[in-house]
Amino acid sequence: MKAVLYMVIPCYNEEEVLPVTSGLFLEELQLLIEKEKISEESRILFVNDGSKDRTWEIIEELARENPHFIGICQSRNRGHQNAVLAGLMEAKDVSDITISIDCDGQDDIATMEAMVDAYYDGAEVVYGVRSSRDTDTFFKRFTAQAFYKVLMRMGVETVYNHADYRLISARVLKEFAGFKEVKIGRASCRERV
């Protein structure tokens, strides 16, 4: 049986890039469906994180035009990681796997197929790892390196240069949702499409 994939894409003031990257995400989703890697029930879930521009209106238009696009609109800006978390929690009961990816198109969308293949080979979590940080500013590269060094000195095992680009199985998400140490819940949504 083919897995239902939900791409979880946090959006904050993305009206400039969303019309372009949404098409790229849809092309990859359709390619994976055509190759019979994933179910036709798979979706692209945009999480509007309180954008001040037309991001939500664009998501609504996309959802009206194509059933593979859906969206949730948070009541206010809650931050990037909370938007990702809201999308993952929204998808956990209706998908077999999720892939979180940023809306800006900087991650290699074509590697989704390899991530899905790794899932079929038994992986529950697949990290996207940056091969280069050339497009990052000096400040971002410096702070990222400092962050990893601090974590290593504290004895924390981490995946160096990993991104928010990752596949997570529904089984892992359901376990994660059960943790009570952190308030994990559904998004404070104003609207859904």
Where are the model-predicted features located?
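Short, well-formed alpha-helical segments that are part of the catalytic scaffolds
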Residues: 14-35
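Conserved donor nucleotide-binding strand/loop of the catalytic core
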Residues: 42-45, 56-85, 89-90
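Acceptor/aglycone-binding surface of glycosyltransferases and processive sugar-polymer synthases
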Residues: 74-76, 80-90, 97-100, 109-184, ...
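Hydrophobic targeting segments
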Residues: 3-9, 18, 25, 42-47, ...
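Donor nucleotide-sugar binding loop of glycosyltransferases
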Residues: 14-17, 51, 108
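Alpha-helix termini
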Residues: 28-39, 66, 91-96
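A conserved acidic beta->alpha catalytic loop
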Residues: 45-56, 105-106
